Amino acid sequence: MRFVIVTGLSGAGKTEATRSLEDLGYFCVDNLPPKLIPKFAEACVQSEGKIDKIALVIDIRGGIFFDDLFESIEYLKANDFNYEILFLEASDEVLVKRFKETRRSHPLSPDGRIITGISEERMRLRELKDRADNIIDTSNYPIRNLREKINLLYGDGKPVEQNLSITVLSFGFKYGIPSDSDLVFDVRFIPNPFYIPELKPFSGEDEPVKNYVLAQEETKGFLSRLSDMAEFLIPNYIKEGKRQLIISIGCTGGRHRSVAIANALYKDLLCKNFHVTLEHRDINEDINRGDRKL
């Protein structure tokens, strides 16, 4: 079990850091009273491995309860919990700018100057910062870079291309475009096996249809360009912190052409070491509905 205590200065990026940890599979709890950490830790142990990565956001918002944090940390240490403290900070200038941009007051100076609250918070958090395992100064960190840093420190060591979950999805336009699609490709320009009597009963997963679709010159040109486009887009999506990508391939009924093309794209991405899954949404939909217009 791995505990990460996320703390630091208000406005330094704890929310974004927590989102990044959540994307990495951490069970995240925001603003838990520090005194409850021991009980929470024991509850996680009793989950029997169902909760094995935890991120607790603890900051000055806890008010008088914040002073209980050190006692709780000692409890974790005494009971051999694998815990780490992540401390986020930024320069006064950057913090003031962020507060002004969001039109928020500082929690330690709700009716006064922002800089006064920042100075007070720095003083109160000095000891906690000294105990931190990792300190990140976000003054010059774009969100993308912070995500990369969090992944480097607290990820599971997967290659960067494995941090984006890709789904290749075939569908039929007659049943609607999948609403969660990121990229949609229309392959109805490819000759349709439906109109060839000996191919009509099969699907794009069967060799006769697959061989027919992939042998078309239109298919070869399309797959070549699609492969190049995916190879260009995916690393850029990863850099921007995107965690899920749905690539939808559509034909008329979602049984022949889109299935064969989706299978080919899936294999191509798999060979390039991307984390990819395959789904054929409408492959049997026409049969189930008794509609043979594919």
UniProtKB/Swiss-Prot annotation:
Protein origin, superkingdom: Bacteria
Keywords, ordered alphabetically: ATP-binding, GTP-binding, Nucleotide-binding
UniProt similarity note: Belongs to the RapZ-like family.
Origin species: Clostridium perfringens (strain 13 / Type A)
GO MF term (any one): GTP binding
Protein task: Displays ATPase and GTPase activities.
InterPro entries, alphabetized: P-loop_NTPase, RapZ-like, RapZ-like_N, RapZ_C
Binding site for ATP: G8, L9, S10, G11, A12, G13, K14, T15
Binding residue positions for GTP: D59, I60, R61, G62
UniProt keyword GTP-binding, yes or no: yes
Protein name as annotated: Nucleotide-binding protein CPE0354
Coiled-coil intervals: none
Signal peptide: none
Gene3D superfamilies: P-loop containing nucleotide triphosphate hydrolases (3.40.50.300)
